[in-house]
């Protein structure tokens, strides 16, 4: 989660102004603000993501981690027509009430009811595993 208070102090403005700036960045489609389920602006987002992977590569001064790129791709793919909230675990999102975890095809989890896995580096799906690239068709 972003430290809005520290950022406000660093740039010499109020916390409310920083939140308005962040909201302006979202409206300009430069970032996506991810909240916990049931929360929304003006509450602090749980995660701020670059709007899409093209922007991520264009403005990042470092090489982006594979997980970060895949989560950005996933969120951007489903954002337009679906409600996106942050789930409880790393890489987990709640999409229209469905828990979806973005992870590599080799990562193993215990089977859980109602949890789907958007797996990158996977060509085909099986059961609750869905290849991440298929979400690109939703955009």
Task: Name each model feature, range by range.
Residues 12, 79-82, 95-98, 109-116:
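Short glycine/proline-enriched coil/turn segments at helix->beta-strand junctions
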Residues 74, 78, 91-106:
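Conserved catalytic cores of phosphodiester-cleaving nucleases, focusing on short active-site segments
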Residues 1-90:
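Accessory nucleic acid-recognition modules appended to NTPase machines
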Residues 51, 100, 118:
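Active-site flanking residues adjacent to catalytic metal/cofactor-binding acidic residues
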Residues 87-90, 103-139:
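Catalytic cores of nucleic-acid endonucleases
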């Amino acid at each position: 989660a972003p430290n809005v208070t520290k950022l406000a102090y660093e740039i010499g403005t109020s916390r409310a102004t920083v939140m308005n700036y962040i909201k302006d960045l979202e409206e300009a489609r430069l970032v996506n603000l991810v909240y916990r389920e049931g929360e929304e602006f003006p509450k602090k987002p749980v995660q701020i993501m670059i709007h899409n992977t093209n922007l991520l590569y264009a403005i990042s001064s470092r090489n982006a981690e594979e997980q970060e790129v895949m989560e950005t791709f996933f969120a951007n793919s489903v954002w337009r027509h679906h409600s996106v909230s942050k789930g409880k675990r790393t890489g987990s999102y709640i999409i229209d009430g469905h828990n979806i975890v973005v992870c590599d095809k080799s990562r193993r989890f215990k089977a859980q009811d109602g949890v789907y896995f958007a797996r990158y580096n996977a060509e085909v799906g099986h059961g609750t595993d869905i290849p991440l690239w298929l979400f690109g068709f939703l955009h």
